[in-house]
């Protein structure tokens, strides 16, 4: 056995967007304050950065929309850390594994070199808060569990997904792994002889209906994951729904 077990609170894809309110981040901060986890993992895509969407019409940088995207990301983080800092308690270790939306600024600057240095990932504000930031697709091992926005497979580097995504994570990576990205939840425990592994796709933390997603909105799991007694890649999983957090902390 390794070191003593720890508790990890996972913030799934939360997509702060200027057209929708950020109250859910205050609820998350209050819950985290009461829970007192050893580690908080933001699995990525806290920032939506809709102004830099590469999937719609050709992107033209509109300064006001870009600033609004950055500001709403900053506001989301401020709401979380305002609650965590109440009573001047020691903060948990705070980890952010950057997602594909979080890195849209740098992708846009790479495609438009004249803006190199003027438009950058740091604009979403993670440097203003005590995050331990990991680059997009770089995993971090915490108590034997890998955390990454999404894991890839094959020569094309496609996200591991599908109907049995958690099981595929275990088979492809041979390690307990937690990912986000798909906004759905899937969970698998493999207790095969000689190994014990756990795979988790952790859903979303979005309380609005995303216009681009259509009927897929109804498939999204909305809440947070609590990994209790994490040690050597194993843990006890708890799921706290977003409606429950709103009922308890939204007053």
Give the role of each language-model region.
Residues 40, 94-96, 199:
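Hydrophobic/aromatic residues located in beta-strands of well-ordered beta-sheets
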Residues 12-16, 44-47, 100-102, 150-152, ...:
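Active-site metal-binding loops of divalent metal-dependent hydrolases
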Residues 72-178, 182-193:
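Conserved catalytic scaffold of divalent metal-dependent phosphoesterases
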Residues 1-78:
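N-terminal active-site segment of His-dependent metallophosphoesterases
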Residues 249-250:
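Intrinsically disordered, low-complexity segments enriched in small/polar residues
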Residues 5, 36-38, 91-93, 173-174, ...:
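A general structural motif
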Residues 26-28, 57-60, 112-115, 193-197:
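Glycine-rich, phosphate-binding/catalytic loops in enzymes
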């Amino acid at each position: 056995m390794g070191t003593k077990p720890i508790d990890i609170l996972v913030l799934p894809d939360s997509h702060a967007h200027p057209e929708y309110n950020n109250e859910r981040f205050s609820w998350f901060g209050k819950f985290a304050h009461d829970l007192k986890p050893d580690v908080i993992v933001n699995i990525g895509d806290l920032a939506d950065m809709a102004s830099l969407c590469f999937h719609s019409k050709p992107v033209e940088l509109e300064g006001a929309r870009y600033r609004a995207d950055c500001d709403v990301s900053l506001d989301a983080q401020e709401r979380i850390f305002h609650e965590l800092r109440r009573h001047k308690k020691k903060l948990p270790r705070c980890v952010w594994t950057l997602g594909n939306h979080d890195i849209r600024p740098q992708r846009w600057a790479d495609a438009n070199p004249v803006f190199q240095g003027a438009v950058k990932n740091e604009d979403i504000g993670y440097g203003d808060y005590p995050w331990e930031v990991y680059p997009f697709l770089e995993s971090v091992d915490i108590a034997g569990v890998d955390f990454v926005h999404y894991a890839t497979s094959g020569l094309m580097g496609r996200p591991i997904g599908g109907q049995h995504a958690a099981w595929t994570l275990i088979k492809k990576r041979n390690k307990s792994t937690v990912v986000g990205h798909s906004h759905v939840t899937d969970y698998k425990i493999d207790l095969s002889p000689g190994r014990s592994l756990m795979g988790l796709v952790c859903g979303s933390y979005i309380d609005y209906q995303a216009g681009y997603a259509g009927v897929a909105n109804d498939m999204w799991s909305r809440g947070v994951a609590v990994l209790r007694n994490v040690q050597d890649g194993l843990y006890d999983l708890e799921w706290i729904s977003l409606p429950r957090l709103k009922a308890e902390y939204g007053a």
